[in-house]
Each structure stands twice: as C-alpha cells, then as structure tokens.
Amino acid sequence: MKRRLTNLFDELPNSKKSLETNFEYGISVSRNLKGKIREAIVNVPTLNFFGAKIEKYVKNVLKNELKNTFKIDKAKNILIVGLGNINIENDSLGPKTLERLIVSRGLNLSPSVCAFAPNVQSNTGIETYETICQISKIVSPDLVVLIDAFATVSVSRLCSCFQFSEKGIAAGSGNNHASKIISKEALGARKVLSIGVPTLIYASSFAKNISNKKIKEEFNSFPMLMLSPTDVKKNVELISR
C-alpha cells in the first residue's frame, strides 16, 4: 500500500518565497516557504552513482534542512513513525529507518524520542490512521515525523530524492486507496513532518521514457502497475541510514 505526500508536487511551484540552494555532487534543495506550511525537496541525482561515498555529505544537507527549514530542534517530545511493510523491499524504508534510531523516551533525556512501525492494514486489519492517532494520544508528542517510501511520476527521482512536507500523509493514496490524512490536526501535535523517498514509479509514467511504440502501449495498458529499480534493496539500505 503506497502513499504519496499530500499535495506535494514532484516539482515545487515557482514562488517568490521558494528558495533553491545548490551543493556539491549535483545536490540541489528547493524550498516552498509560502504560508505556514513548509515544503522542501532535496534532490541527489548522483546518489545511485556515488552511494556510500557521499553518505556523510548528504546527511549533513538533510540535517541542515531539518534544523534550519523545519526547526525540529525545538521539539522536546518526538514521535517517529515508520510507515510501510518491512517484508516488501520497496516499501520497507520507514521500518528500516527506525532500526537506526536512538530512542530516548523513558531515559530522562531531552529530547524525548519514541518510535513505532504500524505495519500495513493488509497485515494487521487495523487502519494505519487509527493506529497512529491512538499512539499519539498516549505519547502526546509536539512533533510527529512520518517516514515512508512512495510512488513518483519521474524516473529521475527514483531512490534519489528526499521530500519533506508539513501537510501530512494520506495512507494508501499512491494506489487509490487513500484514507484520512495523518496531519497535526488529527494527531493533536504542534507539527507533523512527512519525509518520503520515491522507490516506485507507475508503469504509465515510465512509458513516457520509452521510444518503442509497441512497448509503450503495453505499459500504458496497465496504468496502476508499479515498477521499482532492480537494486531497490541496496538503495533502501543506504537511504535508511
């Protein structure tokens, strides 16, 4: 069950309040700071080429966005949710990221960080939205971070683009089974930050890059078919770090 960041376009809209920053290794950051809701895209087109060699550099760029654009360092009580199915490689980004977290809730440390992976409704019989809402009532976080893999319409963004949004996530929207939006209003938190990386692309979108008419028609005949890179397992392992 795939999800897309709610109302977050593959290309951020041009705006006087949109800022773009370029870094080494072809990394670029586009920000939409219009209004109260902030969005950002960190595009790392060379990630699949350089891999672990630029891991530390990419981490620093991402940390900069989290701290300076989204101000998460001000949060004292943080709930981190790893969305997705750990048993499916292209949907396991959320749960795998949680494996690398330092959980401090109950240790008298600040900030207090707790984490959980709700799995998917097809495995649990419980809607993800309902699970997160109930956990949020128990924890009472001022910041909820939702980490997920999702679908994209652009081949160039596969496993190489980090998208941030304060709008929340509608679980299942990537495959037309969307439920209620997991937002700060629904969870009663001061802020909800969604972090997503595309690991799948629709066959119809992929077909736009194919010149062979017959093959293109075959892909277009399965509009809801989703494809992922053959090395998606390696990419998810790298991104989750």
Predicted regions and their residues:
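N-terminal amphipathic/basic leader segments beginning at the initiator methionine
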Residues: 1-37
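Active-site cofactor/substrate anionic-group-binding motifs, chiefly glycine-
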Residues: 27, 31, 55-74, 87
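Helix-enriched interaction subdomains in cytosolic or periplasmic regions
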Residues: 34-59
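Short glycine-rich or small-residue beta-strand-to-loop segments that form or flank ligand, phosphate
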Residues: 43-45, 77-88, 115-119
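A glycine- and small-aliphatic-rich helix-loop capping segment at beta-alpha/alpha-beta transitions
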Residues: 65, 89-106, 161-170
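Gly/Ser/Thr-rich loops at beta-strand to alpha-helix junctions
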Residues: 82-93, 122-123, 149-153
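Catalytic-core regions of hydrolytic enzymes
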Residues: 112-144, 149
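A structural signal for small-residue-enriched, beta-sheet-centric alpha/beta enzyme cores
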Residues: 116-117, 146-241
